[in-house]
Amino acid sequence: FNSTPDVPLLLFWTLSILCLYKAIFEDKKWFWIIAGITMGLAFNSKYTALLLQIGVLAFLIFSSKYRKLLISPWLWMGLVISVVITFPVWWWNYQNEFASFAFQSSERTSSIGKFEIKPTLFFGAVGHQLFLLLPVLFSICIVFSYKHIKKALTKFTLPSQKTLFLLAFFIPTFIGFFLISPVYWVKLNWMMPSYITGIIIAGMYISKKLLKAQLIISIVFHIAVASQVVFYFVPIKSDDTWLGWKELGEKVEKVSENDSEAFIFSIDGYKTSAQLRFFSTKTVFAQNVINQPALQFDYLGDIMDDYKGKNAFYIDSDKRYKNKEKLGELPQMITPYFESYVELDPIIVDEGTIKERKFWVFYCKNYQPKK
């Protein structure tokens, strides 16, 4: 079974909100404990879940009726339990120089800190959220966010307690990511948790006419997407596709039969290497071969010095595939790590179909790791 972290995040985010609702509005104290467990599991899935604790505390601070719960031992017991549940994440980070925390915080905040405003990033975020929610629902989310924020800032008026509760888990994520989008690329899935409560609020605003329009657009959109999935009308010029990876793994196995001791590597981020590691029995690496950060490949226990003197097969996808010609030369960043290389014929998967993809192949000799 293979999954992105967003799947368990959305599951435990939803369960956390349900439990917090019962704990607060139905005064079922044991649900604070369950909420603590689910919030912890949500954080273990993805660090975005920290916004759950922030959301519940923000709600209680702004809620005149339920502010008294800030001194409730049940609230703090739930929060402590949520931290305890995250212990495996903290322990792993402690053992690995806080690598995942650094990746999610310092590396990304340094990019944001440069504060280079790029309108294309903002409009890109708007575009992919329009794609995710479709125009009617997305527009309603924008409208009610504006109305509630305007009332709070100009009239110091807050909505009903239950609406405020829903907003506490929507506004920080939805507005927060849009605020940083002009200076940092916000990915399509980052705002998804906010829509768990955001869509409920949208239901309070949508008219029957708009609901009908959303339904029609949704049906047309899903038919179009399903047709693309089944018939693949439009080729995807990217590694962001599920097509061809299994066949690539099989063909790489065949190409490497002449040197069974050779390892496989790619340096295009992590996708090609990750797919080959999944679909191949060969030893597969990423940028760690050339002494560069390689995300998860840095923590699989491999010591590159152990592969000194071995040969390797370098695999790289031709994302803008136009012909079946060879690349011509090995990328310069790789050549210092090998004595010599020979370019082999490219691997073509799903040949003769619209799904056809191309991968360059180099046979690199005598690996010399460097510090």
Protein language model regions, located:
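Short acidic/glycine- and proline-prone juxtamembrane loop motifs at membrane-interface regions
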Residues: 1-8
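Residue-level signature of transmembrane alpha-helical entry/exit and packing/kink sites
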Residues: 6, 31-35, 48, 74-78, ...
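Transmembrane alpha-helices of multi-pass, membrane-embedded glycan-processing enzymes
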Residues: 9-12, 16, 131, 198
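Membrane-interface transmembrane helices that cradle and orient dolichyl/undecaprenyl
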Residues: 16-31
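Transmembrane helices and adjacent periplasmic/lumenal helix-loop junctions
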Residues: 33-62
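Transmembrane-lumen/periplasm boundary regions of multi-pass, lipid-linked membrane glycan transferases
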Residues: 53-163, 169-178
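Hydrophobic/aromatic-rich transmembrane helices and adjacent perimembrane loops
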Residues: 132-135, 139, 164-167, 171-174, ...
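Membrane-proximal, lumen/periplasm-facing interface regions of secretory-pathway glyco-
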Residues: 184, 188, 211-260, 269-285, ...
